Swiss-Prot record:
One of its GO terms (molecular function) is DNA-directed DNA polymerase activity. Belongs to the initiator RepB protein family. It comes from the Bacteria. It comes from Bifidobacterium longum (strain NCC 2705). Keywords: DNA replication, Plasmid. This is Probable replication protein rep. Disulfide bonds: none annotated. GO terms for biological process: DNA replication initiation. Gene3D superfamilies: Winged helix-like DNA-binding domain superfamily/Winged helix DNA-binding domain (1.10.10.10). It holds the Pfam family Rep3_N.
Length: 297
C-alpha cells in the first residue's frame, strides 16, 4: 500500500485528545488520511484496508478492532471544540456518519460539515505528515508530539510551556506534577522514538528553579534551492518524465531539477505561491498552485 499523507488544519492540534491510546490515534489518523479533501462525502474502509493504513502490529481480532474504532469516535464526541472566531464551545462531533459493521468488516465515515474546514480546502496553516511514520511510533506521547512537531516543520522549533505541553499531550496530573515522572513516562519515549527520526533536541526552561517549559528543536523540512532557468527556455522543452511523489502518485514533470519536498509543498500549498520554488521556476505552475495538479513545468 502506497504511503498516505495526513493533512489537517493547525487548529486541530489545539485539541487535547483525552483518553486516546496509541491505537485510537492510529485509527483517527488513518481515517483523516483518506477523508481529506473529500468534503462531506461518505468514505468506506474495509477492516483489512484500515489495518494496512494503521500498520497494525497488535494481533487484534476483528471484534477488538471494531471496539477500538467505536471507542475512537466516542472519545471524540466527549471532547469540546472552541471555534476561534466566535469563542463558542461545542461537542466535537467531527463525523456525522461513523458506522462500524463488524459482520461485514467495514467502516463508513462522513465528515461533519461544521468541522469540514479542519480537513478540507487547506492552503495555509496546516499540519502534514506521512501516515506510515506516525503509525510506526509506539508511544501515544511520541505520536502526539510528532504531529505537533510537524506543525512547525518549516521553522524546526516548538516553544511551549510545561502546562500547555501537558494539556496538549493529555498528561495525567500525577505525571505532570512530578518532573521525574514527566521525564520517565512522557519525554523518554518521545526522545527514544522521535529523536532519531526528527533529529530532536530538548532545552528545558526554568522559572524560579521550577521547570516552566520546553524548547524543542528538530530538523527543518526546507527544500533545497533549485536553479531557476528563464521561463522562455523551459517553455521550449517538449519532453518530460514521470516521477513518483508520495501521497500524489506519479507526477509528470518537464524539469530535471526535480525536488520531491518542494513539489509536495507546491501541490499542497504549504507555502504561498510567491515563495513556492516551482511557481518561481515557471509561471505556468502558478495556475496549478495548491490544486494537486499532476504536472510540473
Amino acid at each position: 500500500m502506497s504511503n498516505e499523507i495526513v493533512k489537517f488544519s493547525n487548529q486541530f492540534n489545539n485539541v487535547a485528545l483525552k483518553k486516546f491510546d496509541a491505537v485510537h490515534l492510529d485509527v483517527l489518523m488513518a481515517i483523516a488520511s483518506r477523508v481529506r479533501e473529500r468534503g462531506t462525502a461518505t468514505v468506506e474502509f474495509s477492516f483489512e484496508e484500515l489495518r494496512g493504513l494503521m500498520r497494525l502490529k497488535q494481533n487484534l481480532t476483528n471484534k477488538q478492532l471494531a471496539d477500538k474504532i467505536v471507542q475512537t469516535n466516542a472519545r471524540l464526541l466527549a471532547l469540546n471544540y472552541m471555534f476561534e472566531d466566535s469563542g463558542k464551545i461545542i461537542q466535537f462531533a467531527l463525523f456525522t456518519v461513523f458506522e462500524t459493521d463488524p459482520a461485514n468488516q467495514t467502516l463508513e465515515v462522513s465528515v461533519n460539515e461544521r468541522f469540514a474546514f479542519l480537513l478540507n480546502d487547506l492552503t495555509s496553516q496546516f499540519t502534514r505528515f506521512e501516515l506510515a511514520e506516525f503509525a510506526d511510533l509506539k508511544s501515544k506521547y511520541a505520536k502526539e508530539f510528532y504531529r505537533r512537531a510537524k506543525q512547525y516543520r518549516s521553522s524546526g522549533i516548538w516553544k511551549v510551556s510545561r502546562d500547555e505541553f501537558c494539556r496538549l499531550l493529555n498528561v495525567s496530573k500525577s505525571t505532570s506534577d512530578s518532573v521525574s515522572n514527566l521525564n520517565r513516562v512522557v519525554l523518554k519515549p518521545i526522545v527514544e522514538e522521535c529523536g532519531p527520526l526528527l533529529g530532536l533536541k530538548i532545552e528545558r526552561q526554568y522559572a524560579k528553579r521550577r521547570l516552566s517549559g520546553f524548547v524543542f528543536t528538530f530538523a527543518r523540512e526546507t527544500p533545497p534551492v533549485i536553479d531557476a532557468r528563464p521561463v522562455k527556455a523551459k517553455e521550449e522543452q517538449d519532453s518530460g518524465h514521470w516521477t513518483s511523489v508520495a501521497g500524489y502518485g506519479e507526477v509528470f514533470t518537464t524539469t530535471e531539477l526535480f525536488d520531491v519536498t518542494a513539489a509536495r509543498d507546491h501541490f499542497d500549498g504549504t507555502v504561498d505561491a510567491g515563495e513556492c520554488r516551482y511557481c518561481r521556476y515557471d509561471a505556468r505552475n502558478r495556475e496549478r498552485h495548491a490544486r494537486n495538479a499532476g504536472t510540473l513545468f
